[in-house]
A protein has these predicted regions:
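C-terminal cap of thioredoxin/glutaredoxin-like
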Residues: 2-5, 21-22, 48, 62, ...
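Extracytoplasmic thiol/disulfide redox context detector
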Residues: 2-86, 158-167, 199-203
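Structural alpha/beta surface segment adjacent to cysteine/selenocysteine redox centers
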Residues: 49, 55-135
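Short hydrophobic/aromatic segments of transmembrane alpha-helices and their interfaces
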Residues: 36, 45, 91, 136-138
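Conserved short-loop catalytic and cofactor-binding motifs
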Residues: 31, 84, 118, 145, ...
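Envelope-exposed proteins and targeting segments
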Residues: 39-42, 73, 95, 137, ...
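Short, flexible micro-motifs
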Residues: 38, 99, 189
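Short, flexible active-site loop motifs that bind/organize anionic cofactors or intermediates
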Residues: 9, 44, 120, 134, ...
Length: 203
């Protein structure tokens, strides 16, 4: 797992060559979510698109999780942004999240999925990789550059990350919260998540 850091609230240069206590789920206006909002179970994932372990989970577990729980309407899935790892990982993740927000809510998860899918090669040419993803969702290079250098949006991202870390006591990724009850931070198999969802459903 990767430990939490707050990104420097400054313009990104994009020289990018240089991741228990139960509480009631409460939505916030900037949440990004999928699935049935009225589902009995809400799964919140705290993750970073720059986190290698998060990317591994996204590739190996998320497709089956999405099919079984999100697409079926059994779970309300919420993704909350974190910035973790070393300076490069934080910078790349911040750019990825800013780009996903700029692409629009309807493309947010497509952008995140593409960034996760680009691991591990993402760090070989991060700027080029992210720009290519931006173009795939209809952004021009100029729009991409303006997006990832938007100080107001960078500050908003930092505020979301800090809120997630402090209010929800998250300091590592990935962290999963099932109906307000956090699982131990780190990679979890579908079977482990199945068990947590089953337990939450019976409460």
């Amino acid at each position: 797992m990767r430990r939490f850091h707050i990104a420097v609230a400054a313009l990104l240069s994009l020289s990018l060559a240089a991741c228990q206590k139960a509480r009631t789920f409460q939505a916030v206006p900037d949440d990004m979510d999928l699935g049935n909002k009225d589902a009995k179970v809400t799964v919140v994932e705290y993750a970073s698109v720059g986190c290698p372990i998060c990317a591994r989970w996204q590739k190996e577990v998320y497709p089956a999780f999405k099919s079984k729980y999100i697409d079926s309407g059994k779970v309300h899935y919420v993704f909350r942004e974190m910035l973790v790892g070393d300076r490069t990982e934080v910078t790349v993740a911040a750019a990825g999240f800013l780009m996903a927000r700029c692409a629009g809510k309807d493309k947010y998860f497509a952008v995140n999925d593409a960034v996760f899918a680009s691991h591990p090669g993402l760090y070989d040419a991060p700027k080029e990789t992210l720009l290519n993803i931006a173009k795939q969702v209809g952004m021009t290079e100029d729009q991409f550059n303006k997006c990832v250098q938007d100080e107001k949006q960078m500050n908003a991202l930092n505020a979301r990350v800090e809120r997630n870390a402090k209010e929800h006591e998250v300091d590592a990724t990935p962290t999963f919260e099932i109906n307000g009850k956090k699982m131990e931070a780190g990679y979890h198999s579908l079977e482990q998540i199945d068990a947590a969802i089953t337990a939450a459903s019976s409460d």
